[in-house]
Amino acid sequence: MTPPSSPSSRVLPLAWLALVAAALWGVIWWWQIGRAVALPEAPSSRVACVSYAPFRKPGETPLNIHAYVSPERIDADLRALSERFDCVRTYSQGFGLSAVPAIAQRYGMKVLMGIWIGRDPVLNDNEIKAGIATIKAHPEVLRGVVVGNEVLLRGEQTPTALAQYVTEVRDAVHDTHVPVTYADVWEFWQHYPEMAKVVDFITIHILPYWEDEPVEPRDAVQHVADVYARMKAEFPGRAVMIGETGWPSQGKQRRGAAASLVNEARYMREFLRYAGSVDMPYNVIEAFDQPWKREQEGTVGGYWGIFDVDARPKFSMQGPVVEEPRWLLGWWAGVLGAVLFVLAAVWRREWRSRKARYALVLSGFACGTALAWQFRQMWFACRDVVEWAVSGTLCVLALLTTIALARWVAARLGGGPTRGMPDPRARFAWMFGLTLYGLLLVFDGRYRDFPLGLFWPPALGYFIAALLDAGRSWVPTAEERFMACLMPLLAIVTVVQDVGLNPASWLWLGVNLTLGAAALIAWRRAVRLGTHEPQAAYQ
């Protein structure tokens, strides 16, 4: 046991300020995602056309070539969609989707039917044969046929080969008078304008979130209007349809383009107002959230739906929108954390003083709200039992580490004896984990979320403990000192990659600076006291 020694009077206010600020941050963050946000209203709740993929249940994915969706399931989906949409767009003839036109006809819906073109010529030929048969069987239901979706973007066919596929379908169904098109990101029509010669109308995708220069929500619809006008000018006399446009409700922010439910609702409402004002053919993406896309595109890939995976509308087209209706659970998590931290320490004499209890309450509340924040992110991001197990284990470790740190900090602030820092291997592990994830964000961060709620509690705990440590409770190893310098540098790179427009990257920088500063403060004190001996990594 370390005898009580009062921390410097200069650091006490800073330690208390850090605890109060962390608790207030938890209060404010949960409150702001729970407030109702007034948005422009859509002219109607009906939408002209929506992308339809039925793969919304656990384990369903078109990446499984043997996947099959029954006609009964498609019927149930289209019956629900017919209440809000006049048309659905499909992307393939496989997986049972060739039944969509016949079923859509029952509900008075039109279909923008897709024929999937990929790299395999055999699969392409099978798709085309099935598509031609469907077109000839149900021409009156089809608003158009899309031969290939973003094939040039994926680099799976040359423009010449793709044009041959489109022409093959167009010639085969000429007598049905069903128009044939190809769909791709708008820039690729600029790169390959010759594709316009083989289609009846031009179908462009405009996704402001995914632009090379991401567009902020407030400017997104104006961006769509500008691009649409530009494409009309570049292809004079040709009909141009927006084949995909939308906004994600969850996932990583790209520069100023924040994925959120409020922003998705804002975008859809403003886009529908714009589309109605120019009488423009369009299709929005997409009907249902698609969990399988999270494997390819991270969290954000799974949350472009207007309906969730249970076929429930995620937001209305009129009235205010709330980002998180269950926001009070975040506050309750803070209260639970405060109670847990007090119960974990109150049985020892050194934590019974009033100041010590205040410190435990503030620490527990801040930790509880932060881990609730992390759990909310996990709710949207985790795809399977393994990911839940790994993420849950890390959260438990963060909780246990923070409890141990809070007990030590509370004893120092309360003037009681301390019993040493938590296991130094835990400290090293958190620094190593933060460094490793920082490297992943820098070199492979396009689809990775910022796990802020996981790292903030231990980072802040170690920082406050370093401020209050008057002895040699923590002498950082050489490896820890190296990571203390590297972590902020990596975080600065993430800020620069988002050109300073992403608040999450700034918070990530704050986490790295906080934990890095803790190590450097401890080292500076050890040098001053002459307790710094050559250190190596913990065995």
Model regions: which residues?
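Substrate-binding cleft of secreted/luminal carbohydrate-active enzymes
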Residues: 48, 248, 255-318
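Conserved, mostly hydrophobic/aromatic
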Residues: 50, 88, 145, 202, ...
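N-terminal carbohydrate-binding/catalytic regions of secreted carbohydrate-active enzymes
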Residues: 51-128
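Substrate-binding cleft of extracellular glycoside hydrolase catalytic domains
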Residues: 64, 100-179
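Aromatic- and acid-rich polysaccharide-binding/catalytic face
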Residues: 107, 113, 143, 149, ...
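Aromatic-lined carbohydrate-recognition surfaces of secreted/lumenal glycan-active proteins
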Residues: 115, 170-190, 237-243, 280-290
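Glycoside hydrolase catalytic-domain groove-lining segments
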Residues: 210-251, 448-453, 477
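Alpha-helical transmembrane segments of integral membrane proteins
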Residues: 351-539
